[in-house]
Amino acid sequence: MAMTVHCDVVSAEESIFSGLVEIAVFPGEAGELGILPRHTPLLTRIKPGTIRLKVPDQSEFELVYVSGGMLEVQPDMITVLADTAIRAHDLDEAKALEAKKRAEEALANRNAEMDYAAAEAELAQAVAQLQAIQRLRKHTH
């Protein structure tokens, strides 16, 4: 039997995932982070993107979209505190495309009243959601 580590993914609203994983891959600030059982302790921010969780006895990875948050790793426990977390199969492609379009328009029509950082963050989240949807499609087709 493969070694496993307990992983919890929670958002402000609910617990999205709680269980054993063989490996977990996160969208880190400086690139992807792959966490295996008995990993050295770590505390870092994660950026908007897809978390991939390899659950024992499942051939496919569980995919969870996060809008950013914190990742804490202990040798026997992984905890993700996400601003927003949604299972990839629950993402709404039409809503993500609309959010991307709104953010791109806001960035293109810059004026003094616009919050540039908020528009950039909304665009990054929409793009990350669309990437999660595409990754899910690739795994299910």
Curated annotation (Swiss-Prot):
Its main location: membrane. CDD domains: F1-ATPase_delta (cd12152). SUPFAM superfamilies: Epsilon subunit of F1F0-ATP synthase C-terminal domain, Epsilon subunit of F1F0-ATP synthase N-terminal domain. Keywords: ATP synthesis, Cell inner membrane, Cell membrane, CF(1), Hydrogen ion transport, Ion transport, Membrane, Transport. NCBIfam families: ATP_synt_epsi (TIGR01216), PRK00571.1-4 (NF001847). GO terms for molecular function: ATP binding; proton-transporting ATP synthase activity, rotational mechanism. Signal peptide: none annotated. InterPro entries: ATP_F1_dsu/esu_C_sf, ATP_synth_F1_dsu/esu, ATP_synth_F1_dsu/esu_N, ATP_synth_F1_esu_C, ATPsynth_dsu/esu_N. It is found in: Cell inner membrane. It is a peripheral membrane protein. Produces ATP from ADP in the presence of a proton gradient across the membrane. Belongs to the ATPase epsilon chain family. F-type ATPases have 2 components, CF(1) - the catalytic core - and CF(0) - the membrane proton channel. CF(1) has five subunits: alpha(3), beta(3), gamma(1), delta(1), epsilon(1). CF(0) has three main subunits: a, b and c. This is ATP synthase epsilon chain. GO terms for cellular component: plasma membrane; proton-transporting ATP synthase complex. The lineage of its organism: Bacteria, Pseudomonadati, Pseudomonadota, Betaproteobacteria, Rhodocyclales.
